[in-house]
């Protein structure tokens, strides 16, 4: 993968993680708020970030390995958000896995973050799989 693509993907990835700094979960705004960083600090989130960084920045003999690891990383962030959406409240508030509780206890910022993460998945595939300006794929060079 060329340096320009690596840089674009890295900047886009960091920008896509910014909504996690907002309060995404809680019982009531101003009383009980939990930032979206819990999405990154669970095992799925940590592994997803590592896969993205390795996939984009570590050179592999077969370029498809790097592309696949990077794709797993951005998809893993979405999976991490969905996982936390369904489970964060189970041990601390409700004691049960409930779709209704998950919806009721998620702030609008969660949905903003999820949409931004989904946009990052789309961006990743557009940037990685598109051909260069010369009409030559990266692997053809």
What residue ranges belong to the model's regions?
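Alpha-helical transmembrane segments of multi-pass integral membrane proteins
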Residues: 11-22, 76-83, 116
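Interfacial non-cytosolic loop connecting adjacent transmembrane helices
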Residues: 26-41, 82-112
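Cytosolic juxtamembrane helix at the C-terminal end of the final transmembrane segment
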Residues: 60-65, 119-141
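Short, Lys/Arg-enriched N-terminal segments with co-localized hydrophobic residues
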Residues: 1-2, 56
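Alpha-helical membrane-associated segments of multi-pass integral membrane proteins
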Residues: 5, 9-12, 16, 95-131
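Hydrophobic alpha-helical transmembrane segments
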Residues: 42-57, 114-118
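Loop-to-transmembrane helix junctions at the membrane interface
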Residues: 55-88
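N-terminal signal-anchor transmembrane alpha-helix
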Residues: 2-36, 43-46
